[in-house]
Amino acid sequence: MDYAKDVLVSTEWAAQNLQTPGVRFIEVDEDILLYETGHLPGAVKLDWQTDLWHPVERDFIEPQQVSELLGKLGIKADDTIVLYGDKSNWWASYAYWFLTYSGVSNLKIMNGGRQKWVAEGREMTTEAPTVTATTYPALQRDESLRAYRDEVRAHLESVNNGQGAMVDVRSPDEFSGKVTHMPNYPQEGVLRGGHIPGARNIPWAKATNEDGTFKSADELKALYEGEGVTADKDVIAYCRIAERSSHSWFVLRELLGYPKVRNYDGSWTEWGNGVGLPIEKTYSEE
């Protein structure tokens, strides 16, 4: 079977379209300094820490600010935006989800991301592109793509009766409650470990190949259906701060075409600190 939507481009396609009018490349990395060490010619940088988040509240910038951001990057409304980055496109997927949620269309991801481009020895530059600012039109959020804490809590009933599914895309040790964060990552202040009751643990990396590309549609379908996460269910995905769950959201909604998939961006850093929220913990030190 083919992917449900035409949302991926190959590194070869990207190399052939670096100078194509109406095609714009945006790099989004976990390591926000990586872009300066070399990037695709013509690509602009999106900093997930400063560009997408509200400077004070734990929330995103408003749609008007998204329009201003894209305008500052020289993006036009009818441009095809190709996102790519490090970590098998973690943060490129996060930006894809956020921009889709904000009402932006014509989005694609470069399959394999930065690591595949570099591994193939393709052209890189440290030169920042010259950008002519544009006026990007007004945007409207699609709230059907985002899950909030109270919605997640209400969703537990749907999970229990088999109409909904909850996907925890973190590592097995995070899921069990043995640890509250990934190895070699800072502790982000989560007071409790474990997972949301009823969640299925399907680590994000199971959807990728060693070169950072996504697995085939047939493999992805078997992966999720094998855990009872089927297209007829209302699905919510979460991780720690929503970058890994954005990757899984992209797989489920864009590559497999599941109609109802939401990303819980509060994820474990909200749920694990929430007073009175139910938690399952399967790890025991005994």
UniProtKB/Swiss-Prot annotation:
* Coiled-coil boundaries: none
Q: Which reaction does it catalyse?
A: thiosulfate + hydrogen cyanide = thiocyanate + sulfite + 2 H(+)
Whether Ligase counts among this entry's keywords is: no
Give the residues annotated as active site: 239 (cysteine persulfide intermediate)
User: One of this protein's Pfam families, by short name?
Assistant: Rhodanese
Top-tier EC class = transferase
> Cross-referenced SMART domains, in alphabetical order?
RHOD
Where, subcellularly, is it found? Cytoplasm
Q: Does the keyword Cytoplasm apply?
A: yes
Q: Which segments constitute the Rhodanese domain?
A: 19-126, 160-280
Extract one GO molecular function annotation from the record.
Answer: thiosulfate-cyanide sulfurtransferase activity
Give EC number(s), comma-separated.
Answer: 2.8.1.1
Q: Which GO terms describe its cellular component?
A: cytoplasm
Protein origin, superkingdom: Bacteria
Keyword field = Cytoplasm, Repeat, Transferase
What is recorded about the domains? Answer: Contains two rhodanese domains with different primary structures but with near identical secondary structure conformations suggesting a common evolutionary origin. Only the C-terminal rhodanese domain contains the catalytic cysteine residue.
Q: Which PANTHER family match?
A: THIOSULFATE SULFURTRANSFERASE (PTHR43855:SF1)
Any idea what this protein is called? Thiosulfate sulfurtransferase
| Organism of derivation | Deinococcus radiodurans (strain ATCC 13939 / DSM 20539 / JCM 16871 / CCUG 27074 / LMG 4051 / NBRC 15346 / NCIMB 9279 / VKM B-1422 / R1)
